[in-house]
UniProtKB/Swiss-Prot annotation:
The chain crosses the membrane at residues 31-53, 60-79, 84-106, 113-135, 165-187, 196-218, 228-247, 252-274, 309-331, 351-370, 374-396, 403-425. It is found in: Cell membrane. It comes from Halalkalibacterium halodurans (strain ATCC BAA-125 / DSM 18197 / FERM 7344 / JCM 9153 / C-125) (Bacillus halodurans). GO terms for cellular component: plasma membrane. Keywords: Cell membrane, Membrane, Transmembrane, Transmembrane helix. This is Uncharacterized protein BH0208. It is a multi-pass membrane protein. The keyword Hydrolase does not apply.
Length: 459
């Protein structure tokens, strides 16, 4: 088939491309509504954690989440990346382990500001120098696998501790999401319309089912109020923004450096997966040329995290390049042709566009707020499951597996500094300085696992 592809129209500014809804990108209401509820429920999952660790009100925590959504959609509308933006979800369990070592309130805020700044600096420096691939390859595969295993252990540990608070609701949510996303017997069932619909919207189905079961069991209570949520912007800036809290100490920056490095490795791996997915989409359609620029993507992730600090303050999520499950879902639609999705850029725009307006409606807040613990639990459970199988697929010798598990346990219990430190010593003692040339296998393994699923958590 002859290829007559052009890049979608945009307003170019510097290395970026702005594409606005209704001007450059076609609106699709059904996609907007589905995306808004999924994004609010998933992104809002950390709102209770922001309240707990930063000692702020729900209003302030919710405002920070809404501003995060602005920077999420800005990736496509203002900066021109085709990725469905998200957060670096694998980092969340390690972030929680770190915050548990700090005093809730001012110290925890300082710690997260420091972590954001380290991640920003890494993405900027390695983007400008184009050394991201070399930096990522510098870490032996066994150590990377161990860090990812640490995220899995920490995530699963946190959910086991949370279980007694609402056992019926959480177990129901876990069973449904695991059945829809990972069950081999379920996958072998005939591809009926109901099965395809449930599998393609696994997060939404699990939220709705868990909400209904939780309400029937009395574990969840929904309070519906009418009106609009007025974000306390002034209070939020005065409480959490970098303008108010100031720069963290050098001691704190050095403390978070190992975690920041791990988060960058996670983020770079997300970019590898994202680029692989987009290249597949680009090959499937001959009517559009998808502009993939890893250097620009580094800049965008850095700008989004810096913008978060300057316009609101940190969350427990760190902005990342891709929400993998949504990206796969949107690419599946994109491959069906221009009649289904006009441009690769219109997918993320439509999926995210109504999230902020819906997040200002009190009835919507009343419906999704009780589901925050469920959304967080599902996100962490999926993170644990995905990180575990990715970690195990990266190592192919018994020694490497043993090192990975040791690093994972130490990372989850004592923190990333211990995990990486002991991991480096073990690697030198048991494997030596030789490189395990598994990078391509690692990427392909992740790609195959991701492409076999229709939807997944943030990041």
């Amino acid at each position: 088939m002859a290829r007559n592809a052009k890049e979608h129209p945009s307003i170019k500014w510097g290395p970026f491309h702005a594409r606005f809804p209704g001007v450059h990108l076609r609106l699709q209401p059904s996609l907007m509504i589905q995306g808004a509820f999924m994004l609010l429920a998933t992104c809002g999952a950390v709102t209770p954690l922001v309240m707990q660790y930063f000692q702020v009100s729900f209003e302030v925590a919710w405002t920070v989440s809404l501003i995060m959504l602005f920077w999420v959609i800005a990736q496509t509308i203002l900066f021109g990346d085709a990725y469905a933006a998200g957060a670096i979800t694998a980092a969340l369990p390690l972030t929680i382990v770190f915050l548990n070592t700090l005093t809730p309130g001012a110290e925890a805020v300082e710690g997260m500001v420091a972590l954001f700044l380290v991640v920003i600096a890494l993405f900027l420096f390695l983007g400008v120098t184009k050394l991201g691939a070399a930096f990522n390859h510098f870490f032996p595969t066994a150590i990377k696998a161990g860090v990812i295993m640490g995220a899995a252990i920490a995530a699963l540990q946190s959910e086991i501790e949370r279980l007694p608070t609402m056992p019926i609701t959480l177990i129901s949510a876990w069973v449904i999401i695991m059945l829809l996303m990972f069950s081999i017997p379920f996958a072998k069932l005939p591809d009926t319309k109901a099965k395809v619909m449930a599998g393609s919207n696994a997060l939404l189905v699990s939220f709705i089912a868990a909400g209904l079961i939780g309400w029937l069991s009395g574990e969840l209570t929904f309070t519906i109020e009418w009106g609009f949520f007025i974000p306390p912007i002034g209070e939020t800036l005065a409480t959490l923004s970098i303008w108010a809290v100031g720069l963290p100490s050098w001691e704190m920056i050095l403390t978070v450096l190992p975690i920041g490095i791990i988060i960058y490795v996670f983020g770079f791996s997300d970019l590898l997966v994202a680029n692989t997915l987009l290249k597949g989409a680009d090959e499937a359609r001959t009517d559009e040329n998808i502009n993939i620029d890893p250097t620009r993507s580094h800049y965008i992730v850095a700008i989004r995290n810096l913008g978060q600090l300057m316009t609101a303050g940190p969350l427990l999520w760190v902005h990342g390049p891709i929400w993998t499950g949504v990206q796969i879902f949107l690419i599946d639609r994109y491959k069906k042709g221009r009649a289904v999705m006009d441009s690769i850029y219109s997918g993320p725009m439509n999926f995210y566009l109504l999230a902020i307006p819906f997040g200002l409606l009190m009835p919507v807040i009343g419906i999704i707020t009780p589901l925050f613990p469920v959304a967080l639990s599902i996100s962490l459970l999926l993170t644990a499951f995905a990180c575990a199988y990715i970690s195990m697929s990266m190592v192919n010798t018994n020694v490497s597996r043993g090192i990975a598990l040791t690093i994972g346990f130490l990372t989850a219990t004592l923190g990333p500094a211990w995990g990486m430190g002991v991991g480096i010593v073990l690697h030198l003692m048991l494997i030596g300085l030789k490189k395990e040339e598994l990078t391509e296998k690692e990427v392909e393994g992740i790609k195959d696992d991701l492409l076999s699923r229709k939807t997944e958590h943030v990041g």
